């Protein structure tokens, strides 16, 4: 009458998302979320405003801020979800990757600053939009009431004559 069935794979989360009990785990989780194109894990790297007094803030490059002024004037966690979901949808099954090369300059009991270079690849197939973005980033991270670390402030710094992450956010959020 009853039979054992095959286990279904999880629809969200991943074995590569580790509870971020230290700032460095947030960075590793972000790299994995991009590589796996996992929207939920990507958002989990950003501050959970239900468990923290901190609010998320994204500071785009000056060029992207000018080009997508109306988009970035009201940027939010929902904007992060929208752009990432759209970018993921355009890329289909093509591989993606994120490499962060940096270090923490300051770590206190409940906050940290990470600075480094990024190289992100999404094979989205849209003409006129680079599939590689390069630049530097500064993340301000905080620990919430549950002792979980996340990014509260994200500053994108452009590389000369290269497409920035901000350009992708502005383009794919619309």
Residue ranges and their predicted role:
Residues 37-62:
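Short, well-ordered alpha-helical segments enriched in acidic and aromatic residues
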Residues 1-15, 111-174:
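Short beta-strand edge/turn micro-motifs at domain boundaries
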């Amino acid at each position: 009458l009853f039979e054992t069935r095959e286990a279904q794979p999880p629809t969200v989360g991943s074995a590569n998302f580790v509870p971020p009990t230290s700032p460095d785990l947030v960075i590793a989780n972000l790299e994995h979320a991009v590589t796996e194109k996992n929207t939920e894990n990507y958002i989990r790297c950003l501050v959970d405003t239900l468990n923290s007094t901190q609010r998320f803030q994204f500071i785009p490059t000056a060029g992207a801020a000018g080009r997508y002024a109306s988009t970035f004037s009201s940027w939010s966690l929902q904007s992060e979800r929208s752009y990432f979901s759209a970018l993921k949808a355009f890329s289909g099954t093509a591989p993606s990757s994120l490499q962060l090369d940096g270090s923490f300059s300051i770590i206190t009991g409940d906050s940290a600053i990470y600075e480094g270079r990024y190289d992100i690849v999404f094979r989205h197939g849209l003409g006129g939009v680079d599939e590689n973005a390069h630049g530097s980033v500064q993340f301000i991270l905080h620990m919430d009431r549950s002792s979980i670390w996340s990014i509260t402030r994200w500053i994108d710094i452009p590389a000369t004559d290269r497409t920035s992450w901000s350009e992708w956010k502005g383009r794919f959020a619309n």
